Amino acid sequence: MVVLDMMKNKSTIARLLAEEDIHVVNKAMDTAYFNIKKRELGLPIWKDEISKDEEELMVCHEIGHALWTSMDMIEKSAERKLNHSFVNILEDARIEKFVKRKYPGSVNLFKKGYTALAARDFFGIGDEGVESCNLIDRINLHFKMMPGVEFSDIEKVFVDRAEKLETEDEVLD
């Protein structure tokens, strides 16, 4: 009963933050998602219990897609045959910046949530370390507040561009 009440509370909070009556589901899967077309937010149920920090992070992140990622952007990306992972990483950086602006209290939720995910090696870095990752993955980790992500001067140009993203068109360019 307590678990069902917690799921219902997260669902209500997600709807309030998203400012619409999105459909929230909890199911066994690797990560959270937001289906733009169906207006559905999926939260994972993991074999190892998901922490409050991780779940709050995922809610804050996915409602960012509900608020600021349009179906038009998804369609344009597909038409232009852009790399989905690149677009998703850049869009994640953009929408998380917007969530933090709109809901300043979310800044600490993101930090605590990403710290918890990193502790369980959610990002699959393992013993190799951040320096073994390619540029786009390091950019992703940088925006996920992972400490120790370093960039060359040339790479910093791309990080700076990502930090300045404000529109969907800028993400796609």
Model-predicted regions and their roles:
Residues 1-173:
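Short, functionally important secondary-structure microenvironments
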